[in-house]
Amino acid sequence: MDVNPTLLFLKVPAQNAISTTFPYTGDPPYSHGTGTGYTMDTVNRTHQYSERGRWTKNTETGAPQLNPIDGPLPKDNEPSGYAQTDCVLEAMAFLEESHPGIFENSCIETMEVVQQTRVDKLTQGRQTYDWTLNRNQPAATALANTIEVFRSNGLKANESGRLIDFLKDVMESMDREEVEITTHFQRKRRVRDNVTKKMVTQRTIGKKKHRLNKRSYLIRALTLNTMTKDAERGKLKRRAIATPGMQIRGFVYFVETLARSICEKLEQSGLPVGGNEKKAKLANVVRKMMTNSQDTEISFTITGDNTKWNENQNPRMFLAMITYITRNQPEWFRNILSIAPIMFSNKMARLGKGYMFESKSMKLRTQIPAEMLANIDLKYFNDSTRKKIEKIRPLLIDGTASLSPGMMMGMFNMLSTVLGVSILNLGQKRYTKTTYWWDGLQSSDDFALIVNAPNYAGIQAGVDRFYRTCKLLGINMSKKKSYMNRTGTFEFTSFFYRYGFVANFSMELPSFGVSGINESADMSIGVTVIKNNMINNDLGPATAQMALQLFIKDYRYTYRCHRGDTQIQTRRSFEIKKLWDQTRSKAGLLVSDGGPNLYNIRNLHIPEVCLKWELMDEDYQGRLCNPLNPFVSHKEIESVNNAVMMPAHGPAKNMEYDAVATTHSWVPKRNRSILNTSQRGILEDEQMYQRCCNLFEKFFPSSSYRRPVGISSMVEAMVSRARIDARIDFESGRIKKEEFTEIMKTCSTIEELRRQK
């Protein structure tokens, strides 16, 4: 039967139909192949926006650098990065005038953080450029490798465990004439297999020492590796994102801490808050503008879009901002904060994997690594790629491109928000000195601008002034993509405002369903998502009840745990039927053991085990939650667990759910296919790391031991703990004298070995 889809909307207010226009059902698009082309696009575009700047050469690396700061102001509407230093400083001064003491207080807060932060802060985060291996690694491994190299080069400040001391090592490493690193490489040998008598390739992993001179080391320390951003919906073209190395990360963290502290005190900032708190902040600004425009004024709102925010920002501008913000602070603090923008002014973009070539006739595939792009004959490339390579060639050094202007995606979100808010702040009447005035909201590159004026001409004048002020600070409001409505209807960071925020339910669609962690977590996350959407996103009771039934169905199909009395045959049905038949109280069985579903929309907040506990047979309780049962996982689980939810846009969100440890809370093992590759050496390092940590946790069994504050090593801590435990166990009669003596002897041997080392 054909249904005219417009009939669906006859009774629905227009604003509630927003959900239907979002591209958020189904799988998001992922990128394949290399990101080299996207990265070259970014580098070339960034230079084009600043092309009328001044060229200089970096004295250490020889990289050509373009500086657009205080460059010629644009005559047209094309995006450009010519920010004017004096304007930025003045905007900062006015921001401070409107918020007395804001910079001072934020500096004091940040100084405390700087002195307390430990180096393990840098292990957070996913992929990180590992400069020792010249490719991406998990953050913890990259940090471990960096520290290992530093120590073998005699840089030992990091041993205190404080981040600031690690950064001292980073600064000292940049003055070294050479740095010695260990690289992993792979040897292949053809040998004859004794059994099958065939030739096979044997791989062995070797480690070798390798010296980097000052120039090579600096290039690596200043390198951002690039990847393609995955899972971006609603875009035809992919784009490149950057991941910085460990030398840059620590400095960026402190700058962002300062900027975050400032953003928290600014009512126009959409960061660092999120969710309902953000909506409340926005609603306040709107209310303020509406209240003041009741009789004489008209009020309009621009749903704003900036052209290429990151590519027109400039690290030199951020340096000026930081210099101003910290002007009355101690020298050490000012120095440590100014290093991140200085490093970004000298950054190099790694071009990624390079290009893949296929010859259809000869069935050959070959990869052209990025390092070769500087001197390969361009006849092999198509027109668009040829143009890109020609343009980027003058900037290339060792397969990386010098990229002085621009900030890669997501590096200084907080600080760039401060810059944006400083323009919104200038809209007060005491600064505009005329009849129009403005206010608004800023969250990284997204903004909403509310302009009030006595008449339309005033509104137009206000918008023009805002537009031109932005240009002075290197921000380019897009006239094509921004649109204006009477205040009361606008969109900001995918929140749709229409006399109040409209629930944009489609954005939550990807997080419904079975997550695939394990039976216990999935049940808990599934009902929590439904509960949260009833609270935050206008999910009504009838729809929620339906969502719940669909979820349970989905869950049963995923884990093949249909009810014990069902006719559906699956791999597990034999076991489940057996359990069903021998259980007296069938209502007590968990859904994942073939039990009935007892959830409805009134009890979503109760973990399933608690909901059914009173209904369970005693022996079932004993098997399900007995800590001595080898299948009950107590390793990861605390009373509240975190799941990473992927919302339809924006970063992955952490979602809390209640976790009860049962036989269903298993943790799956990792895929081992990595063992045959050149990564194997790294994996072995990682396993050793893992073993040490596991051993350490055995000595300190509480899952939440406090971080050791002293400088004693892990080994010393374990030895002293072993001695204390042994003495207590011996005195209480839990162990025999011989065992006690043996433990003490082992401890002394370990200490002796450490001394000899």
From Swiss-Prot:
Residues 53-82 are annotated as: Disordered. Phosphorylated by host PRKCA. Its EC number is 2.7.7.48. Residues 249-256 are annotated as: Promoter-binding site. One of its GO terms (molecular function) is RNA binding. Its main location: host cell. Keywords: Eukaryotic host gene expression shutoff by virus, Eukaryotic host transcription shutoff by virus, Host cytoplasm, Host gene expression shutoff by virus, Host nucleus, Host-virus interaction, Inhibition of host RNA polymerase II by virus, Nucleotide-binding, Nucleotidyltransferase, Phosphoprotein, RNA-directed RNA polymerase, Transferase, Viral RNA replication, Viral transcription. Residues 286-483 form the RdRp catalytic domain. It is found in: Host nucleus; Host cytoplasm. GO terms for biological process: DNA-templated transcription; symbiont-mediated suppression of host gene expression; symbiont-mediated suppression of host mRNA transcription via inhibition of RNA polymerase II activity; viral RNA genome replication; viral transcription. A motif (Nuclear localization signal) lies at residues 187-195, 203-216. It catalyses: RNA(n) + a ribonucleoside 5'-triphosphate = RNA(n+1) + diphosphate. GO terms for cellular component: host cell cytoplasm; host cell nucleus. Belongs to the influenza viruses polymerase PB1 family. Influenza RNA polymerase is composed of three subunits: PB1, PB2 and PA. Interacts (via N-terminus) with PA (via C-terminus). Interacts (via C-terminus) with PB2 (via N-terminus); this interaction is essential for transcription initiation. Interacts (via C-terminus) with human PKP2 (via N-terminus); the interaction competitively inhibits the interaction between the RNA polymerase subunits PB1 and PB2. This is RNA-directed RNA polymerase catalytic subunit. It comes from Influenza A virus (strain A/India/6263/1980 H1N1).
